[in-house]
C-alpha cells in the first residue's frame, strides 16, 4: 500500500511514479478525499479544544453554589452537548472517508523501482544472462506427449473429477513431483530457510495484505459460506504470518520456505497452454519469502534470486535471467527478476520463477514493522518461487528426453526419485 501522507502532500509525484507502469492512475481524486479528511480532523480538534475550555467553565460554575441551577449554566451544558454531537458527526464522516481512502489506495499498485528498466510490456524486458546449453533439435516431443507415453499423468480423468485444466499425477509422475518437492525443500532449508507449512485456505485480509485483493478477486476461488479463499500462492499466508507485528531487527532477515498447493482461475488465459503442466487451476509450488531490513532489501533481492537459480543449476536445466520492465511488473512488486527455463519443444524460455522485491508495499497493507535507529519503520518483503513444481517437471521431461522414449532424471534428483531413468513399460 502506498503512503497516504505522500498522496496527500505530493499527489503529482505519486501519479508520475505510477505512470511508469504505462497506465494512468487518478491520484488527484484520492488527494481530494485526503484533503477533506484532513480538514475534518482540524474541525474535530477545534471542537474538542472548545469543548475542553467549556468543560472548565462549567466546572467552575458548578462549584459556585449560587449558579448550580442557573439558566446560564444550563445554556453552557447545552452548548457542550452540541459540541459532543458535532464531534460525533464529524467522527462518523471521518470514518467513512477513511474507508473510502483505504479502498482507493488498496487499488493502487506499487511504485516501480528506479532501477527497473522502463517499458510498456514484456517485449521491453531485458535479458541479464543465459545459463546452460539449451537443447535445440527438431521433432522433439512436448512434455505432455512424453507424460502420456510414460503414463505419468492423466488430464482426461481429471476433467471427470473436476473440470479442464486439472491433472492427476500417477506412478512415476506422482513420484517425480514428490521428489522435486522434497529436493527443493532440503536445498533451501540447508541454505538457512525455515520451513513452514501454512494453511491452504486464507481469509480476505490476508489476500488484501499481499496485494491479491481487491484487484485479483476474479482470479481466485472463494468459499461460498466463509470468508475464506483457496490460496493462489504461499506468498499470501507467508506475508500474513507476521501481520500486525513489530519484528525485532536482530532477527532480520527472516527467511522462510514453504511448499503449498496453489489454486488459480487463470481467467485471462483462455485458449493458452491448454495441455500439460504449464497452466493449471491447481499446482504445487515451493515458495521463498524474506522479511528484510529496509536498508538491505536490494542485496536481499539478489540473494533470493540466486537461491531460486541454484535449483535450476543443480537440476542442470538451461535458463535465462530477465529484468522485468516497469510496464510488466506485478501489482505488489517494485522490481522483479524472472527465471525462465528452456522448453525445447517450444524452442523458447518459459517463466518458472518470479523473484520480487516488494519493499514496504505489503508491509504497509499488513502492518508489519521493525525498529530502525530506535524508530518504527515498515519492513521490506521479498518473494520468489523456488520453484514451480509442474513447470520444473515439464522442463525435466523435455530436456531429459531420449530417442528410445525414456527420460533421464537429473543426478541430484536420483536419491529422491530412486532411479536415473523413467522408462516405458
From Swiss-Prot:
<comment type="similarity">
    <text>Belongs to the class-II aminoacyl-tRNA synthetase family. Type-1 seryl-tRNA synthetase subfamily.</text>
</comment>
<keyword id="KW-0067">ATP-binding</keyword>
<dbReference type="InterPro" id="IPR042103">
    <property type="entry name" value="SerRS_1_N_sf"/>
</dbReference>
<dbReference type="GO" id="GO:0005524">
    <property type="term" value="F:ATP binding"/>
</dbReference>
<dbReference type="InterPro" id="IPR006195">
    <property type="entry name" value="aa-tRNA-synth_II"/>
</dbReference>
<dbReference type="GO" id="GO:0005737">
    <property type="term" value="C:cytoplasm"/>
</dbReference>
<feature type="binding site">
    <location>
        <position position="385"/>
    </location>
    <ligand>
        <name>L-serine</name>
    </ligand>
</feature>
<feature type="binding site">
    <location>
        <position position="287"/>
    </location>
    <ligand>
        <name>L-serine</name>
    </ligand>
</feature>
<dbReference type="InterPro" id="IPR002314">
    <property type="entry name" value="aa-tRNA-synt_IIb"/>
</dbReference>
<dbReference type="InterPro" id="IPR045864">
    <property type="entry name" value="aa-tRNA-synth_II/BPL/LPL"/>
</dbReference>
<protein>
    <recommendedName>
        <fullName>Serine--tRNA ligase</fullName>
        <ecNumber>6.1.1.11</ecNumber>
    </recommendedName>
</protein>
<feature type="binding site">
    <location>
        <begin position="233"/>
        <end position="235"/>
    </location>
    <ligand>
        <name>L-serine</name>
    </ligand>
</feature>
<dbReference type="InterPro" id="IPR010978">
    <property type="entry name" value="tRNA-bd_arm"/>
</dbReference>
<dbReference type="GO" id="GO:0006434">
    <property type="term" value="P:seryl-tRNA aminoacylation"/>
</dbReference>
<comment type="subunit">
    <text>Homodimer. The tRNA molecule binds across the dimer.</text>
</comment>
<feature type="binding site">
    <location>
        <begin position="351"/>
        <end position="354"/>
    </location>
    <ligand>
        <name>ATP</name>
    </ligand>
</feature>
<dbReference type="Pfam" id="PF00587">
    <property type="entry name" value="tRNA-synt_2b"/>
</dbReference>
<keyword id="KW-0648">Protein biosynthesis</keyword>
<dbReference type="GO" id="GO:0016260">
    <property type="term" value="P:selenocysteine biosynthetic process"/>
</dbReference>
<dbReference type="InterPro" id="IPR002317">
    <property type="entry name" value="Ser-tRNA-ligase_type_1"/>
</dbReference>
<dbReference type="InterPro" id="IPR033729">
    <property type="entry name" value="SerRS_core"/>
</dbReference>
<keyword id="KW-0963">Cytoplasm</keyword>
<feature type="binding site">
    <location>
        <begin position="264"/>
        <end position="266"/>
    </location>
    <ligand>
        <name>ATP</name>
    </ligand>
</feature>
<comment type="pathway">
    <text>Aminoacyl-tRNA biosynthesis; selenocysteinyl-tRNA(Sec) biosynthesis; L-seryl-tRNA(Sec) from L-serine and tRNA(Sec): step 1/1.</text>
</comment>
<keyword id="KW-0547">Nucleotide-binding</keyword>
<keyword id="KW-0030">Aminoacyl-tRNA synthetase</keyword>
<comment type="function">
    <text>Catalyzes the attachment of serine to tRNA(Ser). Is also able to aminoacylate tRNA(Sec) with serine, to form the misacylated tRNA L-seryl-tRNA(Sec), which will be further converted into selenocysteinyl-tRNA(Sec).</text>
</comment>
<dbReference type="Pfam" id="PF02403">
    <property type="entry name" value="Seryl_tRNA_N"/>
</dbReference>
<keyword id="KW-0436">Ligase</keyword>
<dbReference type="InterPro" id="IPR015866">
    <property type="entry name" value="Ser-tRNA-synth_1_N"/>
</dbReference>
<dbReference type="GO" id="GO:0004828">
    <property type="term" value="F:serine-tRNA ligase activity"/>
</dbReference>
